[in-house]
């Protein structure tokens, strides 16, 4: 069972944990960390979630576990979902926003990646590809991208 950290409306850690999926109290929040990977051609690595996860497009990211820091969550998710190892100091914090219950903390990673060498976690990711900003905006406009990921992309990268 995964346990998540609980935060107040000011994103202050309440030093409380909750099982993933359990109901939070009013004014309690969890953290989700997202990373947008951009290559030297200005294209972003976008993944398509597995059929079990809705077959939507997204960036890489996930829930921040209890006791885990944000960069640790990003490096863990990159390893789990893509088989990609990165150093936490390669990640640039772009900002945070509250979307309902979760806070989304968004990071940027400049890195040239050979997608053929990625090891995709099939339970989470069906495919990956590099896309331009206009291609990503088209996915968002056509409701093909996970909503929170689309909002994050437009806020920090458009």
Residue ranges: model-predicted function:
Residues 6, 37, 46, 108-109, ...:
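Conserved hydrophobic "DFG−1" position in protein kinase catalytic cores
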Residues 32-63:
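A glycine-rich, hydrophobic loop/mini-helix early in the fold
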Residues 52-56, 66, 99-158:
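Nudix hydrolase/Nudix homology domain
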